[in-house]
Amino acid sequence: MSAKPASTHGTSVRPNVASRLSPTTPTLEDLIAQVKEGEVKIPAFQRPFVWKDEQALQLLDSLASNYPVGSLLLWKTSEKLRTERNIGDFTLPDTDDHSPTDYVLDGQQRLTVIYSCLGAPEDESGFAAGYDLETENFIAMSDDLPLTVFPLRALFNTSRLLDYRTALQSRPNKEDLQKRLDSLVRILSGYRLPVVTLKNLKLDEVCPIFERINSSGTRLSIYDLMVAATWSRDFDLNARTKTLAGHL
C-alpha cells in the first residue's frame, strides 16, 4: 500500500527561502556603524523598546562572556515601509528612497541595547552602562561613579578610550585594572553577532515568516505587515481601519 502524500490543503507553494538567505557575522562595531548610517531600520509594526535594565545588563554580560545571544533577522528590500526612525531614544538619519533597507524582523531589543550601550554618544540620553573593573560587573551609569567604572560608550571611541587608560594610571592597582579593561575591550571588539538577511523576497513571501516570528509572546500578523507596507504620507491603513470601525 503506497503512502499518501502530505496534505497541502490550505497552503500554497512556498518560495525557496533558503536560497535567499544571506548569513553574515559582523562585529558589534560594524553593526553599530550600519545603524548610525540609517541602513538598518525598525518597522512601524515592531513593539517599542520594552526591556528592563537588568535584561540589558544580562545581555552585556553574555557578550563579555563570549556567550551566544541569538541572531538578528533582517529583511533587505527596496520596498518603502513605514518605519520608526528611532532606536530606543535615538533618532537616526533618513536614507534615500532608492537604496535597499535592512528592516529588523527579529532582534530589535538586543540591537537597541547594543547601540544604546556601545554606540551612542556619551552625552546622549537613553540607557547607558558601565563595567566596574573592581567587581567585574556591568552596572547602569549614574552620576558620581568611581573612576574604576568604565563607560561602555567609550569602547569604540579611540581618543576617549586612550584618555580612560591614562586616567587608570593613578590607581594603585593599575596593572590589574588595565588587564581587565584590555580583556573587556578585546572580547567586545572581536565579538561577532550572527545576522541572517532575507533578500529578494516579495511582501507575500515574507508574510508567513512574519507569522512564525514570536518575540516575548507577541506575534507579528499579516495585518501588522500590511499596515507597514501600505503606509505612505497620504495613506495609513491602521488609521483608516480605526476610522471605518468607528462608523460601524
Model-predicted segments: where are they?
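Basic- and aromatic-enriched surface patches that contact anionic nucleotides/nucleic acids
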Residues: 2-248
